[in-house]
Amino acid sequence: RHPDRACLDRAAPENPVVICHQSGHMGVFNTAALERLGVTGDTPCPAGGVIGQENGVPTGYMEENAFLEFQKRVPMMPLEAFLGAYRKAQDLYASYGITTVQEGLLRRELVPLYQALLADGSLKLDVVAYGDEAGTTAARQAFPASVRQYQEHFKLGGYKMFLDGSPQGRTAWLRQPYAGEAEYRGYGTLTDAQALDMVRRAGAERMQLLAHCNGDAACAQYLAALETAAREGVDLAAMRPVM
C-alpha cells in the first residue's frame, strides 16, 4: 500500500516532506507540508484527481491532477543546486551514449530553469521539450528561436497532454474494471471538450502533440478527438500526433 502522512510524520515531524511515486502520477505529503499548502478536509479536489481522505481528514495521499496541482506549489530547489544536479544527470546519460533527451512535461515553472541552463552553456545533450498549455506558451516566448528547431541544444517540440494515469497506480482509465474491482476502472483527467481543444490548438499552431493515454478508454478518447479534428480540417499529418 501507499504510505500516508502518519508514516512521513514519524520520519519528519517538523519539516515539510513530499514523496513522489516513481510514475510521477501520485505522491504523499506529510502533515507539515499539508499545513504549509493549506490542504484541509474542505479543500476542493481538482477535476481528474483524488485527495485521499479518511473520516473527512486528508491522509496526505494524492493522485493525478490533485497531486500535480499541489506538487507545483512546492518551492523549487535553489538555482545552483538545480544546475549542479542537472549537470550530473546529463553526464550520466552521456556516459551511456545517449545524446538526445526529452523534457516530457515542460511546465511554466521550469522555463526559467532552462533559461539559466542556456545562459551558462550547461546544455551538452540535445533536449526536446513538450509542455502543457501554459508551459508551451511560456517557452515560445522565452525561446522563440527554438520552436520546432534546435538552438543551443534546446528545441520546443510541441504539446503534451495527459488523458489518464498509470496502470501501476491503478489510475489508468480502462473500459473494464480492474482485477478484483466490481466497478472501478480508473478515470480520465480531461473532458472530451478539453482533449479536443488541445488537438485543435496543436493543429492550428502546427505543433506536435504527445498524449499520455495508458488505458484503452483514454486511448479511445484521444482517437475520437483526433477523428473529430480531422473532420474539421485539422492537418493531422502536419502535427504528427503521438499516443
Annotate each language-model stretch with its function.
Residues 2-129, 150-203:
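Catalytic pocket of metal/acid-base enzymes, prominently hydrolases
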Residues 17, 127, 209, 241-243:
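Hydrophobic/aromatic residues located in beta-strands of well-ordered beta-sheets
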Residues 104-110, 134-136, 217-219:
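Acidic-and-aromatic substrate-binding clefts and catalytic sites of carbohydrate-active enzymes
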Residues 112-116, 139-145, 219-232:
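Distinct, well-ordered alpha-helical segments
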Residues 119-124, 149, 229-238:
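Short helix-capping segments at alpha-helix termini
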Residues 135-140, 156:
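Hydrophobic, small-residue-rich alpha-helical packing segments that form membrane-like cores
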Residues 167, 207-217:
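Short acidic/histidine-rich active-site segments
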Residues 200, 206-208, 223-228:
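Glycine-rich phosphate/ribose-binding loops and adjacent secondary-structure elements
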